[in-house]
């Protein structure tokens, strides 16, 4: 029987996401509906971070303590400092730095 390489890749990706989500949860990140949140291997979280459903973290994202990421946000190459609120529907692109106590509202794109 022939192997289905595409199915193998999809299963590998699914399992790697599960490992990353479980690691975040074990470290105290509040992932609401974790199966809908996608992380990069290098995503880092501070303490008391909450992530709502349907958020995608691309490479090189750091999220500081007490931050809140709302649904349908897409974040890559961004440093989020402490007490920051993002989204919903925010698009944070490479090079974005959000300083302490910042708020990025809905349908905002940064670069």
Model-predicted regions and their roles:
Residues 30-111:
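Structural signal for interior beta-strand "rungs" in well-ordered beta-sheet cores
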Residues 1-36, 41-48:
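Terminal amphipathic alpha-helical/low-complexity segments used for targeting or macromolecular assembly
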């Amino acid at each position: 029987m022939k192997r289905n390489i595409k199915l193998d890749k999809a299963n590998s990706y699914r399992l790697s996401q599960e490992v990353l989500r479980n690691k975040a949860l074990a470290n105290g990140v509040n992932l609401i509906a974790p199966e809908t949140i996608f992380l990069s291997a290098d995503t880092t979280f501070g303490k008391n971070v909450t992530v709502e459903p349907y958020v995608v973290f691309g490479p090189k994202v750091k999220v500081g303590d007490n931050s809140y990421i709302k649904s349908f946000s897409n974040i890559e190459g961004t440093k989020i400092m402490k007490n920051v609120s993002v989204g919903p529907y925010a698009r944070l692109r490479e090079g974005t730095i959000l300083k302490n106590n910042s708020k990025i509202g809905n349908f905002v794109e940064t670069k």
